[in-house]
């Protein structure tokens, strides 16, 4: 493609264009790839020399302002001598010459926004007032643009200012909380008179003879008199004398405008109220007459000698005669809201009225007595200047339409030399919270195809997103508030980010709600709209055209990245979830090799490289940089070699895009406050512009870090910056709704062009080499070999420069390896290295493999490094446990022999391979299935041939990952869930062919860190077990569901977006701290995730609540579907309703070797229990079909009180992940793997609560344990193993804290349920004593941490309104929280012991311990209490005469639950066994009796585990021998 990417610059195109312009010949296209970048320190001849402070300030000048922040008539004024109009725009006063359409600018010396201004009667001076604490009243010379005087006399802001007609005095009125009214002698800089006003003052006006002035406001019209005699005698400040106007029956009105009469009406005063009343006061301050304007609201007033103009709502300006208040006419209305300015080519279009159109309200008026022009400012931030000499033929002199709310982003349209351009050269685009995208062009000689419209000389086109016009008017203009008060705003409105495609044909935009839209730029039609994210889209980026593939990446506050293929109608290629917080920037890099770089508020930078797989392009992480500061933005230079990152500590860090190493770090802001929010590199790669939260903009030399220029002017933080392609302008946008166009000085422009020519000279002298993939797979990062680098002046190079020239070749010429045996290496986990580590590596920068070979004997110790390989034991993960995170497996050129050496990489794959190789069927055959990628069909096309929606193609996993799916996944889906699931799993087996080179995703617990004493090899071995048994069958929903861990209730994915917050008014007036913090909330507080925004951990940590299993999230965005799949498949298996759970006695043990076939899923992980461990069971497949049929017949029943005692796990997952604040790359590497970024196994982490001591009397915890735990805790003597391979377990040195032991251990089953109760003691089998002694009981202080919420007892009857639990259930929950509530224990009858004794499957027959009896008594007591509470609740519902829908639903669910319990008891013969068993009888130690809690009764399952162990031992031995 020959287009320029909007987010980056094509160097060859820019060089050729600039070269041809300088040579005076037409430019031509060159398709050659750009050469490598010169080293960062080479550019010395073109660097600007250090300059004094004044020179730095003047190197960049403000050329044009597109925006206005005037909120009332106090922000608009007119020069009575020349007719120039002055208005406020942030911290700048814009003086406009309407005739010539030229602007002059006066900058406020401080960074406080301006609130009011007024011209002097002679037009030489302007007085301004400020916002903020201790504001200053300043006098400016209009011609010189310098400050003449400043006066400090207010505390909280200035509402309005005015010159006296004789120019002796200036009057300033403070805000309501300031309450100070000052009369200044501005030439002497003293306060002549002062007084306090208790009410809010909105406007003031001087009389023509300067003897008095009038202030109006809330129920306030007051005349203030200046006595010249008293003033001459008194040198100090005197009280200001005021008299109230006599309002009569209008005393309750709010007056918003005032003007003293002129000419023959000089003795009269005119006021207008919000309610639409025009009032006239005579010389005696008496209300003489008033007129109803017949409008819903009026806001401003302006008078001339003969006319009175009243600004009202809906664009109405009424005109009256001054001497008689006779109504004359109305001014023509401005444009209607939503007008297509591109169609307004004829002047008659302005006077065309559209039916039911809405017009913007008038908010400010000023009159030019010289030209008889009336200037009007409307509520949508538009300005019109009308010629009112003849009120019968009013004409428009000048107009402009600006953004009315925060401007979030700016993009410059690419330049083309042919006719492919959709927009004229020099066009730039801006997007705003007013839900518009605006196209601007300041070139008067632009393309004739785009004619100038009658509305604006610079605005070409306005795209109204979804035709929304409700946000076009500034919400800060309300009649019941002053300009100093904030207004809650719709935080979800507006376009947040946009990007132009490289070919200039498409415009991608993301809004505040997470929607992604694609517009085509020929006709501005919306092609695609998709709900992509659950929170606002923060960044968009198209890939570079040199790479040969066109991708679009979108990143959001929901911390997900979606990669779309533009060439496939924006089909979804991959979803990445590496980041643990909001993603602030994403960029594509590389020329032929596609690279993706992203940074976020989690202080991490991820470097990824693309790999071509059979099902599409996938990105694999190659480098991860963890900084100690938040990263807000980044940009890539023209050479695609360096990426500049804006950091919270006000530094700019420059990294190499290939190696991920930091090359430079320098200050990005000259101040000592705030954070860097934006960074942008110019088209030549010479300078970069930065914006700081202190509202400043800096221009910095990219190579030296020296500040070239710094600018101020915006009243809010700068949200976007772009250089133009001609290297002459810098465009900045801000939260003050203004767009500033800065003109770069000639020395800066010359320097940029010179650098482009130097790069062009380099390109002509070197021969680019072909870039190819390496043949065999390497354990290092894949990258292309660059061409030779030639420096500009080798004689002047320093040692760092020479090192930088040699570094790419050293990094990219990694030798290939035939074996998977990795080099010994240090895991660098904590920032910069100490000296010993640098000596170990041999160099500070270059860390190639040779350094490790030379230092094999040195073994460092400390928290900065740990051995990645330990002797003598080697595990099967040695070859890939570390390198797979950073080594992309290139699909092309991989031979079958290579694949054989790489795959399989986990025990499940090893099992399947061995089975095929031996020619017989193993017990584990059929347990592993490939992940299917269902297609939702091709996108539908509209009548223009474009897709009307974004099709979700197959999930972006690394081709087809290995995964086990349990048939119960289908059982757990009801209603729409099952239909949606079946639709997603329609893909045929052809999708899984040819993709066997990819790895298996593993799942581990990520809520706690692993024990410090566990070795690296052991951790890797545990990870191998986790990866293997993530593919284990789970066909026993009953006992497994009793082990579900208690979880804190997380909000649904609908709530995973940024909450609405009260914000700043859309003007530039942040008069309260809440307003000043609004924009910073979107940048500096990206890391402060609220409770509704759970993006602190991995996707597996985001669990679905009990009440959301059977309801869809109403927002079906890509992120929602991605999260939904991960929630239902990554950590916890789908839970069955209570009435579908089968007791252990009722579950037949599978016989024979046939195991249920795994069903397909769309996630890359196996089913795990809630505590992160797998569960092995042996239920027959027929039970799955039976449960499925039950599911079709019975409504879903929630988890009732009968299961609350068994719902707890070893530890409740933490609600805040440790990854939120850590900067350790090693720690973040071990978090969950992205569904679309399979990077290898993750080190399993054991929850720390496993080591907590047992608390007697607490709840029984059902966790997986090994048979080795059946020995007594006191003597720790291991019991003989009844299954598995003894040699394997002995050689693996598995400890009690290993995760793999939990994965292989049989899950305990739920205790038997009985209906017989008494208070007599009962004996418990010793096997249960051992099991209970091995369990960990949680603390009884706060059961809410274990998930005992009200939503666990009663179902949610609808997706929106949960059923409130009755008092009985709330009482039960309250009792469970009280530690003393378990003091009086109810005990079952002795007959109950027979149920336990006679039930099959005890491990041992030892005498029960007293601790066990106490635990069992506690469980039985809670069971009795829960059953009694449920029974009482059911009786109460049955006895009630009037039941609502929720109560009827609760009654039905309770009845269904009771019926299910009864059926289970009858099926398991528990009641008969309880009647026949002798009381107080212990079971005989009969070796033939099978234990109830042992699920290994199936010989097939036992044989499978033994075979697993044997295969593992063989793999370890083979690996140790180096096979």
UniProtKB/Swiss-Prot annotation:
Localisation per UniProt entry: Nucleus; Cytoplasm, Cytoskeleton, Spindle pole; Cytoplasm, Cytoskeleton, Microtubule organizing center, Centrosome; Cytoplasm, Cytoskeleton, Microtubule organizing center, Centrosome, Centriole
WD repeats: 109-150, 153-194, 196-234, 291-330, 357-396, 411-450, 490-529, 532-574, 578-618, 626-665, 671-713, 714-752, 803-846
Acidic residues bias: start-end ranges: 797-809
N-acetylalanine PTM sites in chain numbering: 2
Residues with PTM Phosphoserine: 33, 501, 966, 972, 1117, 1143, 1169, 1234
Primary location: nucleus
PANTHER family in UniProt: WD REPEAT DOMAIN 62, ISOFORM G (PTHR45589), WD REPEAT-CONTAINING PROTEIN 62 (PTHR45589:SF3)
Protein name in UniProt: WD repeat-containing protein 62
Organism in which the protein naturally occurs: Mus musculus
């Amino acid at each position: 493609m020959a287009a320029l990417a909007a987010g980056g610059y094509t160097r060859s195109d820019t060089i050729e264009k600039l070269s041809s312009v300088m040579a005076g010949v037409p430019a031509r296209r060159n398709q050659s790839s750009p050469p490598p970048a010169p080293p960062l320190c080479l550019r010395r001849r073109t660097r600007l020399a250090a300059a004094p402070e004044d020179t730095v300030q003047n190197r960049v000048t403000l050329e044009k302002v597109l925006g206005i922040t005037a909120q009332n008539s106090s922000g608009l004024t007119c020069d009575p001598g020349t007719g120039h109009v002055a208005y406020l725009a942030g911290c700048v006063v814009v003086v406009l010459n309407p005739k010539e359409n030229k602007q002059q600018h006066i900058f406020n010396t401080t960074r406080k926004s301006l609130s009011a201004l007024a011209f002097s009667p002679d037009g030489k001076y302007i007085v301004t007032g400020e916002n903020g604490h201790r504001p200053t009243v300043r006098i400016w010379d209009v011609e010189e643009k310098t400050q003449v005087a400043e006066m400090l006399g207010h505390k909280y802001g200035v509402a309005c200012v005015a010159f006296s007609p004789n120019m002796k005095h200036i009057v300033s009125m403070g805000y309501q909380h300031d309450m100070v009214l000052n009369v200044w002698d501005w030439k002497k800089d003293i306060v002549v008179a002062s007084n306090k006003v208790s009410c809010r003052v909105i406007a003031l006006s001087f009389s023509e003879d300067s003897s008095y002035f009038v202030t109006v406001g809330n129920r306030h019209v007051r005349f203030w008199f200046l006595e010249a005699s008293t003033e001459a005698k008194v040198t100090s400040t005197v009280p200001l004398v005021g008299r109230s106007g006599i309002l009569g029956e209008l005393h309750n009105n709010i007056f918003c405008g005032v003007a003293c009469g002129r000419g023959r009406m000089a003795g009269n005063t005119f006021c207008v109220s919000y309610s639409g009343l025009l009032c006239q006061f005579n010389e005696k301050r008496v209300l003489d007459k008033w007129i109803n304007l017949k409008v819903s609201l009026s806001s401003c007033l302006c008078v001339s000698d003969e006319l009175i103009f009243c600004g009202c709502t809906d664009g109405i300006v009424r005109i009256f005669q001054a001497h008689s208040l006779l109504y004359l006419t109305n001014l023509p209305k401005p444009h209607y809201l939503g007008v297509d300015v591109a169609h307004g080519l004829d002047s008659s279009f302005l006077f065309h009225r559209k039916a039911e159109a809405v017009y913007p309200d008038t908010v400010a008026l000023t009159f030019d007595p010289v030209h008889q022009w009336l200037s009007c400012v409307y509520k949508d931030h538009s300005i019109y200047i009308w010629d009112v000499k003849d009120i019968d033929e009013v004409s428009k002199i000048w107009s402009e339409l600006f953004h009315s709310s925060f401007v979030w982003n700016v993009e410059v349209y690419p330049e083309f030399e042919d006719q492919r351009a959709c927009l004229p050269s020099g066009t730039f685009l801006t997007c705003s919270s007013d839900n518009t995208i605006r196209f601007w062009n300041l070139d008067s000689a632009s393309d004739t195809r785009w004619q100038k419209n009658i509305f604006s000389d610079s605005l070409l086109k306005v795209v109204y997103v979804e035709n929304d016009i409700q946000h076009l008017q500034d919400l800060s203009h309300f009649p019941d508030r002053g300009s100093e008060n904030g207004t809650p705003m719709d935080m979800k409105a507006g376009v947040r980010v946009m990007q132009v495609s490289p070919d200039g044909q498409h415009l991608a935009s993301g809004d505040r709600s997470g929607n992604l839209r694609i517009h085509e730029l020929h006709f501005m039609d919306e092609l695609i709209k998709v709900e992509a994210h659950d929170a606002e889209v923060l960044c968009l980026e198209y890939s570079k055209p040199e790479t040969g593939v066109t991708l679009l990446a979108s990143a959001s506050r929901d911390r997900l990245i979606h990669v779309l293929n533009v060439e496939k109608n924006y089909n979804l290629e991959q979803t990445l979830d590496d980041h643990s917080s909001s993603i602030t920037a994403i960029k594509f890099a590389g020329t032929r090799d596609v690279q993706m770089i992203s940074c976020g508020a989690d202080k991490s930078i991820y470097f990824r490289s693309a790999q071509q797989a059979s099902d599409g392009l996938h990105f694999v992480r190659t480098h991860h940089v963890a900084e100690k500061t938040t990263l807000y933005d980044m940009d890539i230079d023209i050479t695609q070699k360096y990426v500049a990152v804006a950091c919270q500590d006000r530094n700019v860090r420059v990294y190499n895009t290939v190696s991920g190493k930091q090359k430079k770090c320098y200050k990005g802001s000259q101040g000592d406050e705030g954070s860097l929010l934006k960074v942008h590199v110019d088209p030549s790669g010479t300078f970069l512009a930065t914006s700081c939260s202190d509202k400043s903009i800096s221009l910095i030399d990219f190579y030296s870090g020296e500040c070239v220029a710094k600018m101020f002017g915006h009243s809010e933080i700068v949200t976007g910056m772009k250089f133009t392609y001609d290297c002459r302008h810098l465009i900045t946008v801000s939260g003050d709704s203004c767009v500033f166009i800065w003109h770069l000085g000639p020395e800066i422009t010359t320097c940029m062009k010179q650098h482009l020519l130097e790069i062009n000279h380099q390109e002509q002298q070197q021969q680019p080499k072909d870039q190819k993939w390496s043949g065999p797979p390497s354990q290092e990062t894949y990258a292309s070999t660059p061409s030779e680098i030639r420096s500009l002046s080798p004689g002047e190079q320093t040692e760092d420069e020479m090192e930088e020239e040699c570094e790419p070749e050293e990094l990219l010429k990694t030798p290939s390896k035939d074996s998977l045996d990795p080099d010994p290496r240090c895991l660098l986990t904590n920032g910069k290295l100490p000296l010993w580590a640098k000596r170990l590596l041999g160099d500070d920068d270059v860390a190639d493999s040779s350094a490790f070979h030379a230092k094999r004997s040195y073994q460092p110790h400390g928290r900065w490094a740990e051995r990645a390989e330990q002797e003598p034991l080697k595990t099967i993960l040695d070859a890939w446990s570390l390198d797979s995170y950073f080594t992309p497996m290139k699909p092309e050129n991989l031979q079958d022999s290579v694949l054989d050496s790489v795959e399989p990489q986990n025990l499940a794959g090893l099992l399947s391979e061995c089975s095929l190789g031996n020619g017989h069927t193993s017990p584990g055959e059929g347990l592993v299935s490939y992940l299917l990628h269902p297609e939702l069909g091709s996108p539908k096309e509209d009548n223009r041939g474009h897709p009307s929606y974004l099709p979700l193609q197959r999930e972006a996993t690394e081709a087809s990952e290995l995964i086990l799916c349990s048939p119960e996944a289908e059982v757990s889906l009801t209603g729409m869930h099952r239909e949606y699931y079946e639709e997603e799993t329609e893909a045929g087996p052809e999708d899984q062919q040819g993709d066997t080179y990819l790895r298996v995703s593993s799942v581990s617990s990520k809520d706690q860190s692993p024990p410090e004493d566990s070795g690296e090899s052991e951790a890797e071995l545990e990870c191998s077990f986790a990866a293997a048994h993530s593919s284990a069958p789970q066909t026993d929903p009953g006992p497994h569901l009793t082990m579900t861990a208690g979880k804190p209730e997380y909000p649904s994915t609908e709530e995973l977006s940024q909450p609405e917050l009260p914000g700043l008014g859309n003007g530039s007036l942040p008069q309260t701290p809440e307003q000043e913090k609004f924009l910073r909330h979107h940048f500096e507080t990206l890391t402060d995730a609220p409770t509704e925004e759970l993006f602190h951990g991995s996707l597996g940590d985001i669990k679905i609540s009990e009440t959301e299993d059977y309801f869809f999230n109403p927002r079906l965005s890509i992120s929602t579907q991605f999260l939904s799949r991960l929630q239902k498949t990554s950590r916890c298996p789908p839970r069955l309703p209570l009435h579908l759970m089968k007791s252990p006695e009722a579950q037949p043990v599978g016989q024979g070797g046939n195991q249920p076939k795994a069903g397909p899923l769309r996630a890359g992980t196996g089913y795990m229990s809630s505590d992160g461990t797998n569960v092995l069971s042996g239920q027959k497949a027929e039970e799955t079909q039976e449960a499925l049929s039950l599911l079709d017949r019975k409504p879903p029943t929630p988890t009732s009180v009968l299961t609350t005692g068994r719902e707890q796990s070893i530890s409740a997952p933490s609600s805040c992940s440790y990854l939120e604040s850590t900067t350790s790359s090693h720690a973040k590497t071990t978090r969950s793997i992205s569904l679309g970024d399979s990077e290898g196994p993750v080190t399993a982490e054991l929850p720390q609560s496993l080591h907590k001591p047992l608390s007697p009397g607490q709840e029984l915890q059902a966790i997986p344990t090994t048979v080795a735990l059946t020995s007594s805790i006191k003597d720790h003597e291991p019991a003989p193993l009844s299954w598995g391979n003894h040699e394997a377990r002995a050689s693996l040195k598995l400890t009690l804290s290993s995760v793999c032991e939990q994965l292989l251990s049989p899950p305990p089953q739920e205790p038997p349920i009985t209906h017989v109760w008494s208070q007599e003691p009962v004996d418990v089998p010793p096997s249960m004593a051992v099991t209970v002694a091995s369990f960990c009981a949680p603390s009884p202080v706060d059961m809410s941490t274990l998930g005992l919420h009200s939503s666990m007892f009663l179902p949610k009857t609808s997706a929106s309104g949960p059923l409130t639990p009755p008092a009985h259930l709330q009482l039960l929950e309250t009792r469970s929280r009280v530690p003393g509530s378990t003091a009086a224990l109810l005990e079952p009858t002795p007959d109950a012991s027979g149920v336990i004794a006679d039930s099959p499957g005890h491990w041992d027959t030892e005498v029960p311990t007293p601790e066990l009896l106490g635990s069992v008594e506690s469980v039985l007591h809670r069971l009795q209490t829960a059953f009694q509470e449920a029974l009482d609740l059911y009786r109460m519902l049955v006895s009630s005469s009037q039941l609502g829908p929720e109560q009827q639903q609760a009654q039905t669910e309770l009845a269904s639950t009771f019926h299910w319990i009864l059926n289970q008891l009858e099926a398991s013969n528990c009641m008969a066994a309880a009647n026949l068993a002798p009381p107080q009888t212990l079971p005989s130690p009969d070796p033939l009796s099978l234990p109830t809690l042992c699920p290994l009764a199936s010989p097939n399952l036992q044989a499978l585990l033994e075979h697993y162990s044997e295969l593992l031992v063989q793999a370890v031995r083979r690996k140790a021998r180096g096979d």
